[in-house]
């Protein structure tokens, strides 16, 4: 098998920023800086989800990332006219079309390519005509693979959330087999196969059984781990500066 690439989803860097500094351009944490730190650590691409409600990533983030990254930008988005038009203007290298509900905490499952095949095909054609490679975020289901092909997608991203949330080994094995079959079929149909959602250090190795994977997209887990791993040093350095108070 070829080397497996890692895409880092930086949405939750923006989540932290928006919780405190929604309208301030110099707010922290800086999304571009954090994206570049991920790249220095070995990230092969950066993913950002521009949601309709703009709860974390904003339009200006996408523009800044596109103009400054030295790795591909993968823009996640719903099939919504306004965001499609924006994407065609910005032209990220990759777009991943995902389902979206306003009341969800995060994307809850794959897009239904079977039910929305005609609408998706129109959007995918527009995006591909603009020189953008298009992926569909789908559940590991063979009918969804067939419809992804019919839509004209270049790639699929297999939803690994059900695998990640499996409560026991038997359930995990069932989900791995679904992913294996979906990946094999997608590969046979000429689609690049990526995977993402809920992937952690604890469940990563189970995915090594899935053939033909090109890239894993991981976000929340790595951002959360970065907070834990980096918090001690950050507090230590801050406290060192505070010691100067006694010397004034």
What role is predicted for each listed range?
Residues 81-89, 141-151, 195, 199-213:
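Catalytic cores of alpha/beta
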Residues 1-75, 80-82, 86-92, 150, ...:
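Conserved N-terminal beta1-alpha1 strand-loop-helix module at the mouth
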Residues 9-15, 51-53, 76-82, 100-102, ...:
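Active-site beta-loop-alpha junctions enriched in small/polar residues
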Residues 4-10, 46-48, 73-75, 95-97, ...:
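Hydrophobic faces of well-ordered beta-strands that scaffold small-molecule active sites
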Residues 96-104, 155-167, 212-231:
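Glycine-rich phosphate-binding active-site loops on the catalytic face of alpha/beta enzymes
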Residues 66, 168-172, 225-247:
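C-terminal helical cap(s) of enzyme catalytic domains, especially alpha/beta-barrels
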Residues 133-185:
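Histidine/lysine/aspartate-rich catalytic loop segments that bind and position anionic ligands
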Residues 50-125, 144, 158-159, 179-185:
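N-terminal active-site wall of soluble small-molecule enzyme domains
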């Amino acid at each position: 098998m070829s080397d497996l690439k890692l895409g880092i989803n930086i949405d939750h860097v923006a989540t932290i920023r928006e919780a405190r500094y929604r309208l301030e351009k110099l707010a922290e944490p800086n999304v571009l800086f954090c994206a570049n730190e991920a790249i220095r650590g070995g990230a092969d691409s950066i993913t950002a989800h521009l949601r309709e409600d703009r709860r974390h990533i904003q339009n200006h983030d996408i523009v800044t990332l596109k103009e400054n990254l030295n790795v591909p930008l993968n823009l996640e988005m719903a099939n919504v006219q306004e965001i499609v038009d924006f994407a065609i203007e910005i032209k990220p290298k990759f777009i991943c079309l995902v389902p979206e509900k306003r009341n969800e905490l995060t994307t809850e499952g794959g897009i239904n390519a079977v039910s929305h095949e005609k609408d998706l095909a129109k959007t995918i054609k527009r995006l591909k005509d603009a020189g953008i490679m298009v992926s569909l975020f789908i559940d590991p289901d063979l009918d969804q693979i067939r419809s992804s092909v019919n839509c004209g997608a270049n790639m699929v991203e297999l939803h690994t959330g059900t695998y990640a949330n499996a409560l026991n080994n038997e359930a995990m094995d069932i989900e791995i087999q679904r992913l294996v079959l979906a990946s094999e079929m997608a590969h046979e149909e000429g689609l690049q196969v990526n995977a993402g959602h809920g992937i952690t250090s604890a469940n990563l190795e189970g995915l090594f059984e899935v053939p033909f994977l090109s890239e894993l997209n991981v976000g929340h887990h790595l951002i959360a781990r970065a907070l834990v791993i980096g918090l001690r040093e950050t507090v230590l350095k801050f406290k060192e500066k505070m010691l100067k108070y006694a010397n004034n």
